[in-house]
Amino acid sequence: MSTIDTKTSRGLLGKKLGMTQVWDENDTLIPVTVIEITPNVVTQVRTPEADGYNAVQIAYGQIDRRKVNKPSAGHFDKAGVTPRRHLTEVRTADAAEYSAGQELTVDGTFEAGQLVDVVGTSKSKGFAGVMKRHNFQGVSASHGAHRNHRKPGSIGASSTPSRVFKGMRMAGRMGGERVTVLNLKVQAIDAEKGLLLVKGAVPGARGRIVFVRNAVKGA
């Protein structure tokens, strides 16, 4: 059984462009999400000796140097790369094979037909009630129900326990959370344009940043 210290992982940051449809080799129309993945760069390699674990820090998205604070600017200078807007770490056992300043491309990291996981931030829906947020059934439309058809109902007992239990599903802010979709198939790769076509939907709105990695639970 592989652990986080022995497992080899690959991952890249990209931008969700939207959804479209493509035909496969069997003339079946496949819905796909288009993810733009311009080359990521390695900004730091973490080792057990220096950091206690193996990992690769990657960066994505150009940003004006004037908008970067001095500690971040020094970090990018040490890696020999221009400042980038987004950073993330990939825990992988083969981190020693990477070097600071190395470019990682979509065609060099993924291949058509493999399974990937996509991590993103779900669309924000604002303040939502329990029927929309938690799929509650609501209150009866008749039989004495009066102006409370979409209310949650009771949220706890009276004298015992005289409180509302933690985790009670109630109305509140919906969406805007980190979501991971597992085992999506890479339908196609356009290396020239830096595009990754993934079968199905991925979290987030158009233009949002997503993290694509090889499937951790894939067959």
From Swiss-Prot:
HAMAP family: Ribosomal_uL3_B. Residues 140-163 are annotated as: Disordered. PANTHER family: 50S RIBOSOMAL PROTEIN L3, LARGE RIBOSOMAL SUBUNIT PROTEIN UL3C. It comes from Leifsonia xyli subsp. xyli (strain CTCB07). Part of the 50S ribosomal subunit. Forms a cluster with proteins L14 and L19. One of the primary rRNA binding proteins, it binds directly near the 3'-end of the 23S rRNA, where it nucleates assembly of the 50S subunit. This is Large ribosomal subunit protein uL3. Keywords: Ribonucleoprotein, Ribosomal protein, RNA-binding, rRNA-binding. The keyword Transcription does not apply. GO terms for molecular function: rRNA binding; structural constituent of ribosome. One of its GO terms (biological process) is translation. GO terms for cellular component: cytosolic large ribosomal subunit. Belongs to the universal ribosomal protein uL3 family.
